């Protein structure tokens, strides 16, 4: 029994980054709770501690007007417990998953709070990071030999990528607490869904229909980025609560959380190839800024600006098949009239010119392979996973001045990822190396890591996050230098850190 469920295509899916790294932990030996002789509940879960230490000083200014001196300080001391309950009532399977997290306010986090509060931008990071969440609560039942229903709060996964998403569009992600983790199911935001799947045996496939009725809270919609000045805020915004100036509006006429999302997916096989065709109407994952000077639909409620999640249509397809000694994967997701901010590039108000809609195609090609053994002490062959992502603005014009952070966005934004992992001592020691490089703008990330699995219950993992800049990417200083060339990995400048995680799973 796993701690998170997902809908996957029929046939070979490839090794993938999640399979190569540690999956959501469980022992397979659930604790059984007998409520009555006819009602037995299986309990699984974990208790986990996270710790992160800054490896560089940040240039942002503290409340005292001097740069925050935070090298060597803890940026995270987080403690989480996840519980999954599962039981069978007649022909219906019930699952409930809850997660409870608390953070110790380190000196570094206190400095970030003081810096934001001194600017008149109130910030309480403890409230931001602590959580008591019903992650999932759903029932599964078979209505007929062909028809299956899953009803409730759940995760549905379309697509086969990690770190960056192409066709995985049903849910948003919370990227404000930690980033670049392998277990997407931990950071994906589950939704209340009606999920129906009908098997078409004659065509070796199935049809899935989804409806999100619109009863989720606004914070469950779209991706959550650190826009409040915490540890994952992009440079130079640590210690600056941007949301105090530009709050979220989840009830905008261009995108309202109460409006339903809906779509469908065909999953099938043709020979050794697994494929899907997908359509989904929803709120887009990335927020955009709606400025009062040139509003996109309704003017901001605060008379200045606000973050909104406009409604979009996404049409896509995925495929995977064995090739040579491994598995190739591909995804394509087309979004007509996708909204972007534009104008005033190279200034603190980049994107304040308003919103332009551009047809956008997201593409991914990946390849996974088991390599030859690297030595007699390796207990299994090394696994290599490669991915190439491209965000293509199909009707791109340079004069549109589409904003990528504070700089100009290109027609093609291409990122490559590579993961190498292997196992020693009967799979109890698992070193790994992740490389992420921004081919279009420069910069990237190197993550060397190692995981120790001494038995069924304990998992110890350590990683280093080493960001770098190159090519066209620079970073913005607190005094505004570098605004014209700051792209994705420029915002991660000076964010190198060591991360340790200890988990007891049951």
Predicted feature descriptions by range:
Residues 64-71, 121-125, 178-182, 248-252, ...:
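Extracellular loop and loop/strand-boundary signature of outer-membrane beta-barrel proteins
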Residues 87-229, 465-471:
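Outer membrane beta-barrel
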Residues 76, 88-91, 280-282, 329-339, ...:
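Detector for outer-membrane/organellar transmembrane beta-barrel domains
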Residues 45, 81-87, 136-141, 194-198, ...:
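Residues on the lipid-exposed face of transmembrane beta-strands in outer-membrane beta-barrel proteins
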Residues 53, 73-79, 130-135, 188-192, ...:
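Residues that define the transmembrane beta-barrel architecture of outer-membrane proteins
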Residues 27-43, 85-94, 142-150, 158, ...:
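Short loop/turn motifs that connect adjacent beta-strands in outer-membrane beta-barrel proteins
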Residues 482-506:
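Outer-membrane beta-barrel "beta-signal"
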Residues 49-55, 89-91, 100-104, 155-157, ...:
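Transmembrane beta-strands of outer-membrane beta-barrel pores
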């Amino acid at each position: 029994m796993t701690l998170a469920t997902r809908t996957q295509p029929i046939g070979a899916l490839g090794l993938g980054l999640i399979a190569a790294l540690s999956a959501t932990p469980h022992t397979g030996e659930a604790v059984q709770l007998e409520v009555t002789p006819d009602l037995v509940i299986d309990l699984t879960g974990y208790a986990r501690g996270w710790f992160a230490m800054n490896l560089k000083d940040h240039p942002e200014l503290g409340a005292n007007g001097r740069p925050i001196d935070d090298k060597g300080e803890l940026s995270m001391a987080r403690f989480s417990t996840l519980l999954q309950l599962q039981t069978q009532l007649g022909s219906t399977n019930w699952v409930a998953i809850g997660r409870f997290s608390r953070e110790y306010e380190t000196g570094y986090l206190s400095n970030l709070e003081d810096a934001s509060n001194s600017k008149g931008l109130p910030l309480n990071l403890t409230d931001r990071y602590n959580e008591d969440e019903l992650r999932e609560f759903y029932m599964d039942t078979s209505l007929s030999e062909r028809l299956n229903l899953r009803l409730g709060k759940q995760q549905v996964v379309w697509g086969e990528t990690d770190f960056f998403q192409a066709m995985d569009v049903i849910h948003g992600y919370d990227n404000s607490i930690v980033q670049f983790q392998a277990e997407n199911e931990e950071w994906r935001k589950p939704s209340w869904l009606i999920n129906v799947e009908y098997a078409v045996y004659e065509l070796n496939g199935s049809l899935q229909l989804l409806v999100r009725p619109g009863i989720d809270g606004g914070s469950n919609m779209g991706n959550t980025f650190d826009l409040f000045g915490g540890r994952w805020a992009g440079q130079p915004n640590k210690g600056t609560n941007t949301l105090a100036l530009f709050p979220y509006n989840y009830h905008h006429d261009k995108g309202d959380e109460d409006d339903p999302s809906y779509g469908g997916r065909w999953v099938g096989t043709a020979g050794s190839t697994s494929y899907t065709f997908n359509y989904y109407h929803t709120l887009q994952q990335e927020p955009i800024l709606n400025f009062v000077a040139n509003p996109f639909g309704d003017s901001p409620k605060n008379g200045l600006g606000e973050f909104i999640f406009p409604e979009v249509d996404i049409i896509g397809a995925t495929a995977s098949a064995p090739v040579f000694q491994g598995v190739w994967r591909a995804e394509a997701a087309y979004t007509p009239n996708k909204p972007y901010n534009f104008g005033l590039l190279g200034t603190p108000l980049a994107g304040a010119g308003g919103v332009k809609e551009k047809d956008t195609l997201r593409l991914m090609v990946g390849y996974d392979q088991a390599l030859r053994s690297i030595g007699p002490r390796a207990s299994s062959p090394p696994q290599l996973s490669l991915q190439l992502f491209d965000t293509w603005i199909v009707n791109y014009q340079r004069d549109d001045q589409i904003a990528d952070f504070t700089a100009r966005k290109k027609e093609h934004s291409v990122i490559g990822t590579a993961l190498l992992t292997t196992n020693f001592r009967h799979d109890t020691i698992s070193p790994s190396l992740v490389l992420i490089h921004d081919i279009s703008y420069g910069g990237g990330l190197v993550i060397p890591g190692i995981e120790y699995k001494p038995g069924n219950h304990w998992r110890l993992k350590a990683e280093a996050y080493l960001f770098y800049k190159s090519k066209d990417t620079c970073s913005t200083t607190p005094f505004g230098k570098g605004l014209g060339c700051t792209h994705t990995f420029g915002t991660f400048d000076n964010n190198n850190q060591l991360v340790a995680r200890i988990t007891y799973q049951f």
